[in-house]
Amino acid sequence: MHCPFCAYADTRVVDSRLADDGGSVRRRRECPQCGQRFTTFERAELALPVVVKTDGRRESFNEEKLQRGLTRALSKRPVATARVDAAVRMIQRRIRERGEREIPARLIGELVMEALRDLDPVAYVRFASVYRRFEDVDAFSVEIARMKEAEVPDGGDDLNRGD
């Protein structure tokens, strides 16, 4: 790596540590030419597929949009941030595992609903009401009944355990 201070072409790593809970590596580097030290971060670049919207438009997958949607649905609900972050990672992992270059936005919505069902039933119904465009109280009742039928007796998946 080039030195950002003198542009010397070869710096050396003096120290490496895991950062971001193992999601990246923090490296301290030193330039043998000018003696300056600086920090770099290294993380895997994992491309997510392009999202195909219902109207046919295509846009890049946006992790922040996913995080915002979950956070909005969970607003004022007793769910730890670590669990929301775990849900975002789980959704991204499931999308990557499909191995497709494009995915429908509908699939992301369904994955979000699945995660919310495990995180908080109130947030799930809140999100479902917007996502599925509930028109009346009966739609809420039907969704709640469907949710109760699908309840998992052992407490759900890893999202219920926290990180």
Swiss-Prot record:
Cofactor note (record): Binds 1 zinc ion.
Domain of life: Bacteria
Domain ATP-cone: 49-139
unnamed Zn finger ranges: 3-34
Pfam families cross-referenced by the UniProt entry: ATP-cone, Zn_ribbon_NrdR
InterPro entries: ATP-cone_dom, NrdR-like_N, RNR_NrdR-like
Keyword terms, alphabetized: ATP-binding, DNA-binding, Metal-binding, Nucleotide-binding, Repressor, Transcription, Transcription regulation, Zinc, Zinc-finger
PROSITE patterns: ATP_CONE
Single biological process term from Gene Ontology: negative regulation of DNA-templated transcription
Keyword Metal-binding: yes
Molecular function, one GO term: ATP binding
Cofactors demanded by this protein: Zn(2+)
Family stated for the protein in its record: Belongs to the NrdR family.
Name the record gives this protein: Transcriptional repressor NrdR
Organism annotation: Acidithiobacillus ferrooxidans (strain ATCC 23270 / DSM 14882 / CIP 104768 / NCIMB 8455) (Ferrobacillus ferrooxidans (strain ATCC 23270))
Lineage, highest ranks first: Bacteria, Pseudomonadati, Pseudomonadota, Acidithiobacillia, Acidithiobacillales
